[in-house]
UniProtKB/Swiss-Prot annotation:
Protein name: SPbeta prophage-derived uncharacterized protein YomT
Amino acid sequence: MTFDEVCGLFKQFDGLEQKFLLLSDGSYISVDDFKQRFEGDFNEYEPLSSLQSSPSSTPAWEGIWNKLQEDGLFE
């Protein structure tokens, strides 16, 4: 699963200058911010472990985490 495939789990919409991901709780995060959040830690060859090792303290991240769990992508 690649970074783009993770993004594909969420509805995407275009803003004025960038794309956003709509998260399960109605909040959103820009694709650029999402990628930057995992810059350095994100491993496109092992994306799920990269996501699991990232902090879960923000509402946006909780939406991403919940969506991946609901879809059965985390054990």
